[in-house]
Amino acid sequence: MDSNTVSSFQDILMRMSKMQLGSSSGDLNGMITQFESLKLYRDSLGEAVMRMGDLHSLQIRNGKWREQLSQKFEEIRWLIEEVRHRLKITENSFEQITFMQALQLLLEVEQEIRTFSFQLI
């Protein structure tokens, strides 16, 4: 995984965790959980692409990987909509910056996952 993407994920998760401390919002906790899940999925997909010989074992081991891929894209779209909504309603500049960076990261990761998936098909 690109080191910038790793640090971006870590930065966004840290910022959201700080925001969570000041909020009782369950939605924010759900977003943090989905960001962490997305990071792990993106990492594993990237590793599979780097080990192209692992492609067949990936397909054999998990015959439903295309279905999972589709589910991840739906999760990304949900996260994008949720982040956009949060961005519209917040007036706190720290939160605005965090959500703008989260939105940019989601769009980048969506593109990376698309690229990886095309290489795996």
UniProtKB/Swiss-Prot annotation:
Keyword GTP-binding: no
Single GO cellular component term: virion component
Chief location category: virion
Keyword tags: Host nucleus, Host-virus interaction, Transport, Virion
UniProt keyword annotation of Repressor present: no
GO biological process annotation, one example: exit of virus from host cell nucleus through nuclear pore
Domain of life: Viruses
Motif Nuclear export signal location, chain numbering: 12-21, 85-94
Pfam families found in the cross-reference section: Flu_NS2 (PF00601)
Role according to the record: Mediates the nuclear export of encapsidated genomic RNAs (ribonucleoproteins, RNPs). Acts as an adapter between viral RNPs complexes and the nuclear export machinery of the cell. Possesses no intrinsic RNA-binding activity, but includes a C-terminal M1-binding domain. This domain is believed to allow recognition of RNPs bound to the protein M1.
Subunit comment: Interacts with protein M1. May interact with host nucleoporin RAB/HRB and exportin XPO1/CRM1.
Family note: Belongs to the influenza viruses NEP family.
Name assigned to this protein: Nuclear export protein
Organism: Influenza A virus (strain A/Silky Chicken/Hong Kong/SF189/2001 H5N1 genotype A)
